[in-house]
Amino acid sequence: MKRTYQPSNVKRARKHGFRARMATKQGRSILKRRRAKGRKRLTV
């Protein structure tokens, strides 16, 4: 049986990357929250 997690860096960046976050209002609010919290890494 094939496992469910088949990692791909391209898919990862497209779904959760910085540009993907900046593309939507919700995504920008996530970045804002993470900056406020003082996260070292905002996105993957």
Swiss-Prot record:
Keywords from the named record: Ribonucleoprotein, Ribosomal protein
The region called Disordered is annotated at 1-44
Against InterPro entries, the record matches this protein to: Ribosomal_bL34, Ribosomal_bL34_CS
> Gene Ontology terms, cellular component aspect?
ribonucleoprotein complex; ribosome
Where on the tree of life does the source sit, at the highest rank? Bacteria
One of the GO BP terms on file: translation
Q: Which GO terms describe its molecular function?
A: structural constituent of ribosome
Q: Which PROSITE patterns match?
A: RIBOSOMAL_L34
Basic residues: compositionally biased ranges: 30-44
Entry's NCBIfam families?
Answer: rpmH_bact
Q: Which family is this protein grouped under?
A: Belongs to the bacterial ribosomal protein bL34 family.
Q: Which HAMAP family match?
A: Ribosomal_bL34
Name used for this protein in its record: Large ribosomal subunit protein bL34
Q: Which organism is it from?
A: Desulfosudis oleivorans (strain DSM 6200 / JCM 39069 / Hxd3) (Desulfococcus oleovorans)
